[in-house]
Amino acid sequence: MYPPELDSKILSIIKKAVTIRTTHTYEYQYSLLFGDAGYLWLLLHLFSISKNQYYLQLANVTAKKLIENYDTLEEIDFALGKSGVLLSLIKYYQFTNDNTLKIFIHNSIGEIYHYFLQRDTAKESILDYSFAHGYCGIAYALFAYSKVLEPSMFYNDLHTFHTELKKLLEKVTSNTENLGNLQLSWCKGISGIILYLCMYDCDGNKDIISKYQEFVFNHHLKMMTGYCHGITSLLQTTVYNQNKLLMEKIQQVILACSERDDHGLLMFQGDSGKADLFDFGIGSMGYIGVY
């Protein structure tokens, strides 16, 4: 449970958001990163902590909207497309056990799976295998489906994919000259692959995860401090494998690159080198979100 004062503030913000969301439309408005799928995830999180039925009621409305508009989505990926939406609906199913929803998810996962099978393993592109826009995010949606709805489903495919990831990481990290901010990032690079390995099998990938956490950290001067393109996403991976020593090092780097605004608030570096406060992907909100 949240403290009463904080709970009241959160509820007030959500009620304002309801008004805004019913009067405005946005690009990628159904997506996990920018739209209703992410909003649904938040509502379920708030309900699980507060047990306030209001959040679940909003979640019901949001899930219905996602289902009704699912076929309008053009992207397949985790951040903007169908994989992210299905992941949120899978989470929603855990709260409802609704059979109609289960059938919808079951009928929809095939398209994601087919796209996943069509990947060109010969390309070995870090971008193609990335979390936000590549195969890692799609694989995680398949993993969540098999974990919640059909145990052992996709097991062999995900095991093969896991082997591909290990080979890709070895190849990509053997040549550091071409590694820049995005190649090290969560959305398009190595940090996102590390996060997938953490969520897929943290214990089984313990040595690999630690190895590439150190690799990314050793190149942190090429990165900013935000979540999407910066080192904060690497900080999240240290929570999974309890790498406390590296966690402290990353925190020190983030704090060293920060500054105070006119109100004394701690600001973190965005991609532009400036301090961005209210942005999850490139600003301070991503750092807060990790905690």
Placement of each model-derived feature along the sequence:
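Glycan-recognition and catalytic cores of secretory/periplasmic carbohydrate-active enzymes
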Residues: 1-291
